C-alpha cells in the first residue's frame, strides 16, 4: 500500500463492509451503542481535565487486534481524540 492509497475515496460497498465489521466486533465484545456512548462521555470528561479537545470530532470504536498472548484476534477499544490545546493546570474534580 502506497502513501497515495491513504487518500483514495472508499467505495460505498467498502464503507458498508467496514461498518458491518465494527458492528460485529462490538456485538462480540457485548458492547451496546448505549455503553459506547457512556464510555465516550466518560472519556471526554476525564481527558478534558488535562487538555482542550474537540469533543464533537471524538471517535471511539471497538475493533479487532492481534493478541500477543494467544495468537488470536481480540477486541480493542480505539479512540481518536483531536487535541486543541494542553491545559497548564488540570481541572480538579
Curated annotation (Swiss-Prot):
Keyword annotations of the record: Cell cycle, Cell division
Cysteine pairs bridged by disulfides in the record: none
The protein's name in its UniProt record: Cell division topological specificity factor
Chain's role: Prevents the cell division inhibition by proteins MinC and MinD at internal division sites while permitting inhibition at polar sites. This ensures cell division at the proper site by restricting the formation of a division septum at the midpoint of the long axis of the cell.
Family, as annotated: Belongs to the MinE family.
Organism: Agathobacter rectalis (strain ATCC 33656 / DSM 3377 / JCM 17463 / KCTC 5835 / VPI 0990) (Eubacterium rectale)
Biological processes, Gene Ontology terms: cell division; regulation of division septum assembly
Pfam families, A to Z: MinE
